[in-house]
């Protein structure tokens, strides 16, 4: 008699029932585990979102007088089509020689951050501070004077009217916020030339006096991890080869290095960064 014929039919039937019952229980456990894991992931995502939302309250928000902001209404349909799906934010860096005063001062740094809402790609464009533009009422002068004359509303209007834009969002920072941010990130790596190292000396001395820091001068060119004062001094260099073209390039280089460093930082560092710096924005 074959081995198959020796199998007890009743025992085999019970075995199949038990096997199916076990598989159902195992599948149910897997579903419960999957749901549990998904709940944990969703809770973690929610916790991170709530964490950053809670920190946003630290940012000093100024309610713009929209009646004072001019938007170029003569933009062609072709340009409007290209601009659809993008958001442009004006970024101003003030030379106000004082901490925390973001309502006045010349905007010696003017950048436009263009955000692709679909890909989240960000492109930075600088507006040279010595560019002669209509700063309001048909008066043409250096564009960095608009912020000093009428605050963010006039500076934004100047950009909209002269550059065919429709900006309504902006960010303003001063020396102190940049210095604090770089220091909290542990510095930023920069390649410095001999000429740049020499030109940074005067700016480092001035920033030390303004902020109470004791940043050291650079004796020669090379690759350095710049602290906040040194990075700000580097971004402020306005002499040497390249003039304002090179100066704005340095500003974008520092900002890009800060973003990359922040992306590599742990949550504790990011938390400190938000707590310390958001009040200066």
Predicted features and spans:
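Solvent-exposed, polar/charged alpha-helical surfaces in well-ordered, non-transmembrane soluble domains
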Residues: 141, 145, 153, 157-161, ...
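Flexible, solvent-exposed short loops/turns enriched in glycine
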Residues: 123-150, 204-205
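Soluble non-cytosolic domains of exported or imported proteins
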Residues: 103-107, 137, 146-153, 172-176, ...
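Short, solvent-exposed loop/turn elements at domain surfaces
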Residues: 97-103, 121-124, 133-136, 244
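Extracytoplasmic
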Residues: 84-87, 104-110, 119-127, 138, ...
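Entry/capping segment at the start of metal-dependent catalytic domains
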Residues: 3-9, 21-120
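Flexible, polar/acidic helix-loop-strand segments at domain edges
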Residues: 183-270
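Second-shell loop/turn segments in exported
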Residues: 98-101, 141-149, 164-169, 237-246, ...
């Amino acid at each position: 008699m074959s081995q198959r014929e020796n199998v007890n039919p009743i025992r085999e039937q019970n075995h199949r029932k038990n096997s199916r019952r076990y598989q159902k229980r195992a599948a149910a456990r897997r579903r419960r585990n999957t749901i549990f894991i998904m709940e944990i992931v969703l809770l973690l995502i929610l916790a991170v979102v709530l964490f950053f939302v809670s920190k946003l309250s630290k940012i000093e928000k100024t309610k713009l007088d929209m009646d004072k902001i001019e938007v170029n209404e003569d933009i062609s349909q072709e340009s409007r089509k290209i601009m659809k799906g993008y958001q442009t934010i004006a970024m101003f860096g003030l030379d106000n020689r004082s901490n925390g005063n973001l309502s006045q001062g010349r905007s010696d740094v003017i950048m436009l951050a263009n955000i692709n809402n679909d890909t989240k790609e960000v492109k930075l464009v600088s507006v040279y501070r010595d560019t002669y533009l209509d700063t309001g009422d048909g008066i043409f002068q250096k564009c960095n004077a608009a912020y000093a004359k009428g605050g963010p509303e006039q500076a934004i209007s100047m950009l909209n009217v002269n550059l065919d834009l429709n900006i309504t969002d902006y960010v303003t920072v001063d020396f102190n916020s940049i210095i604090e941010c770089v220091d909290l990130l542990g510095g930023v790596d920069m390649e410095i030339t001999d000429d740049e190292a020499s030109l940074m000396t005067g700016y480092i001395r001035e920033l030390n006096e303004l902020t109470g820091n004791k940043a050291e001068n650079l004796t020669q060119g090379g690759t350095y991890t710049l602290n906040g004062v040194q990075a700000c001094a580097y971004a402020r260099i306005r002499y040497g080869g390249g003039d304002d073209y090179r100066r704005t390039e340095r500003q974008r280089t520092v900002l890009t290095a800060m973003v990359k460093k922040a992306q590599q930082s742990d949550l504790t560092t990011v938390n400190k960064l938000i707590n310390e710096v958001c009040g200066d924005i």
